[in-house]
Regions:
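Core catalytic alpha/beta fold that binds nucleotide/phospho-ligands
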Residues: 1-204
Length: 204
């Protein structure tokens, strides 16, 4: 059974100033923080770097490599990881096998997007939901489940997943609804998920 931790961090609960940690996180995220003008976007990138340093000890460029589809991996450690962010939340998934995570603020149902991205069975499920609120929630849940699976495989919705025969049913998917968001984690085998909310009371 795979070992999996999913760490949640709220960007609005940072207990220190960004300048305290910019020199202690992966330069990739420090540079994105300084480049982004929108505060929410900048803080998301900063917290990504903080979580990598805090939970995996990753803060130097030479510690990370990239697959052919751009998915990052650790060069000198057995652990696999994946990051996602939306709104006030940043998520870090850590596992001893490949993992994909996705978090999304609940979004409006869009029929054309559903037809393009979801299976026929999923489209029928969406069409049968009567209330707009419930349909939006289901649409977002399905989106995060698919995104987690595709991120596990190192691609995304634009990565030719239909042509590659990706079948969501072959994966173990864990999903949680939380205050206007959906969070999903995908692995190849059934696993127990340890969900941790990072309190951000100390630096990296």
């Amino acid at each position: 059974m795979e070992q999996v931790r999913v760490i949640l961090a709220n960007i609005e609960r940072m207990k220190y100033e960004p300048e305290e940690v910019l020199g202690e996180i992966l330069p990739y995220y420090a540079e994105k923080y300084t480049r982004y003008k929108r505060e929410e976007d900048a803080r998301q990138e900063l917290v990504c770097g903080i979580l990598l340093r805090k939970y995996l000890g990753v803060w130097k460029t030479g510690q990370v490599g990239y697959g052919k589809d751009g998915k990052p991996f650790l060069l000198e450690r057995q652990w696999k990881y994946n990051l996602s962010h939306s709104g006030v939340w940043v998520v870090l998934g850590i596992s001893d096998a490949e993992i994909g995570v996705d978090i999304e603020r609940i979004r409006r149902y869009h029929s054309a997007t559903a037809r393009k991205l979801f299976t026929e069975e999923e489209q029928v499920m969406l069409e049968q939901v009567e209330s707009e609120e419930a349909r939006n929630a289901l649409f977002t849940r399905l989106w995060t489940e698919w995104e987690a699976v595709l991120k596990l495989e190192g691609s995304g919705f634009a990565g030719g997943w239909r042509e590659n025969g990706v079948d969501k049913a072959r994966y173990a998917i864990w999903t949680k609804e939380m205050d206007g968001y959906f969070l999903s984690a995908a692995t190849r085998d059934a696993t127990l998920i340890c969900l941790v909310e990072d309190e951000q009371r100390r630096k990296c």
